[in-house]
Each structure stands twice: as C-alpha cells, then as structure tokens.
C-alpha cells in the first residue's frame, strides 16, 4: 500500500510538467486575432537621453500587452508642445506626450500629458518628481497604469507580479533544482525567493494582500503545504498529514486555505478548507480524486477538478454547506482541469481538453450563458492564472520539442504575448500565479 502511495504522491508533482509533454508530438501555435482598438502614440520632448527613450519603450510595450489598447512610438523626433503634434500624419486616437527634466545626476521630473484627436485641451496630465534612473521600469509601469485607467476606465496591471516555478534538470534522478521565482508581469526583474534541490515546489498561490505565497512541496520524506512570507523569506509548514497534501490556495480574506488531502495512504483526494489560526479542517468533497481548488472572489464557493464521473471535470461547491456537496459546472465540457475564477466572478478560466480538438487549450466558461470558448489554440497549454483585474490570462505552453514557455493571452483570445521561454528541454517553467494587486 505504501509503495503504491509513494507512486501517487510522486505522480502529483510530476503531473505539472508531464502534462506539458503529453502532446509533445503535436505543434503548439497561438495566433493573434485582429481587432480594432484605440491607437496610442507615445512621444517625448527628449529623444537624445537614454532614460526617456527607455521609459517610453516600456510604456509602448505595456500598452500593447492588453486587450483594450494598442500603441507605438513612431515619431522619433522631439515634440515640445501639443501644438507640434502632427495629427494629420498620425493615425492615432490619442497621444501621450512625455516631458523630461533632468534635475541632477540620475534624477528626473517627468510630466505626462494625454491628448485626444480633435481636442485642443489636455485630456489628463500628471507629474512624477525626483525619479531616479534606477526606477526606470517602475516609472514606466506607473505611467502605463495611469494612461490605461484614464483611457479605458479599468485599472492597469502593469505593476503586478508573477510567481512561477523553474525546474532545471527535471528528468534527472538526482540534482533536480526547483526555484520559485517572482518577476514583474512582463518577465523582467526576476528574483528567486525559494530554491530547493530534489524537493519539488508546486502550485504556488498568492494571498490577497500580496504578502504570502502558499505552495506544496515534498520535503523530509513527506508531502506538505507551506507558506512563504515574501518580505522575509520565512517558510512555515502548515500541514503534515499522511499522504497527499497539495494544490493550496488562499481564501479572499486570507484566513483560510483550500487544499487537497488524501488523509492517509489512499488513492483518493478530497477538498478541505483549513482555518489558518486553528488548523481546523472542513471537508468539502467525499468521493473521487478531487484537486486544484480555488475560492470564488466573494469567498462563498470553491471551484475544483474531480474525476468522480469517470473523467476530470470542473465542479463547484458551497463553502457554507453543512454536508459535503458539489455539482458539475457544465455538461458541455468534455475534460477540464485547473479552474480559476475571474476577479469579477463572472467567468471561469481552465485547461480544456475538448472532444472536438486535440491536446489541451486554455478556455473561458461564461457563468451567465454557459458558453465555453477556447482562448488559445495550442496542443499543450496548461496552468492558467488570471490577472487581478481580469483582462489577461498567463499560462504555460509547451512545443513539440518539449520546450515550455510562460505566455499571456487576453481573456477574449485576441492578443497573445510571450513572457519567458525555456531555451532547452532541460529547463521547465511551471505553475504561474498572478499577484492579486499592483505593487
């Protein structure tokens, strides 16, 4: 029995990267759709200094990494005043005019003006003072958030973070290196916050205040769930049950986690809610293999994967039920894994294995009308995580050679961007988790 259980526990961890190679003989492709979005041109009063050019380049990249705007910096000469903007030759709907004042060595004041075609007044303006050049990318993301919010009415996500796992030598018997990495949303400013050899790190998930990451790991001869305090690097083990302890995620208020436990050497796992103060458990499911739980934004429901009817699918359970009970999300879905609510609670994004297509894609389920829409068209797409304001989804894609990449797609499926690519098959990228807020 114990030998069988060890195989099950090992399988939980290797599934994360084996799913990437499950369809290794098939090509993963994502196409970018064509959609008419307002065009923003970013211009500057300084095209000589390196700092203004760098900031504006990041702003343009940010404003192209979303579903609502597109941007360019086609004007390569200085524009000092709004009267100098060549609107007739521009196809832009808006211009973002950036003005840079070099106060002292490596210190700038930056004024940002948003102008609209056929409008002689400033639409919006803001000034950032005493900016050190070391904060170049942070400043650019702040400006992008400002512009995005003013032009779309939605909060920008350009100061959010991504946590993900990088595995080196993943197929070696010994010497496998697992690193938990936090980066900017666009893959820059990477920091390794946890490093382990031969002890897997799996399914990291943020707390809503952005202070903690909860994850599962196999350490000291057994599987457990841990929290990492990001500011200090302090790691705390919070479960020590026999068998499987996996797939943890925080409740919206941060007082509980949902997780999957086998509670002994069983081939079944069930969903539980753990109170982090008392460590008391509430059981949510009663049969089958149940895993990957995520709370709804209001904390009243949990969505998860279960094979109770013969194949993996998505189920929903109320956290307030007196007895364990849950229902299948939709009979339209053939096989599904790794569900995530969007922040408004109106959609569920998941890994979809349709009966009509080969491989796995990232799909969106509309809770209002029950529609299911694939938003990627690769053959081995997995591990979706939704941006904190719901516009974008980050996920893992794997190509025919087994190379994994961290990619991003808009929720409507029209825009696709690469964040990071493993340059050889000896490195795997796994389990992305989008931070709950801007930093």
Swiss-Prot record:
Q: Name one GO cellular component term.
A: periplasmic space
- Gene3D superfamilies named among the record's database cross-references: TolB, C-terminal domain, TolB, N-terminal domain
Which keywords appear in this protein's UniProt record, sorted alphabetically? Answer: Cell cycle, Cell division, Periplasm, Signal
One GO term under biological process is:
protein import
**InterPro entries annotated for this entry?**
6-blade_b-propeller_TolB-like, PD40, Tol-Pal_TolB
Disulphide bonds annotated for this chain are none
| The organism's place on the tree of life at top rank | Bacteria
What is the predominant subcellular site recorded for this chain?
A: periplasm
Keyword Signal listed? The answer is yes
Give the signal sequence positions.
Answer: 1-24
Note whether Signal occurs among the keywords.
yes
List where in the cell it is found.
Periplasm
Subunit structure of this chain's protein: The Tol-Pal system is composed of five core proteins: the inner membrane proteins TolA, TolQ and TolR, the periplasmic protein TolB and the outer membrane protein Pal. They form a network linking the inner and outer membranes and the peptidoglycan layer.
Query: Which family, according to the similarity comment?
Result: Belongs to the TolB family.
Functionally, this protein is described as follows:
Part of the Tol-Pal system, which plays a role in outer membrane invagination during cell division and is important for maintaining outer membrane integrity.
> What is the recorded name of this protein?
Tol-Pal system protein TolB
Protein species of origin: Francisella tularensis subsp. tularensis (strain SCHU S4 / Schu 4)
Highest classification ranks of the organism = Bacteria, Pseudomonadati, Pseudomonadota, Gammaproteobacteria, Thiotrichales
Underlying gene: tolB
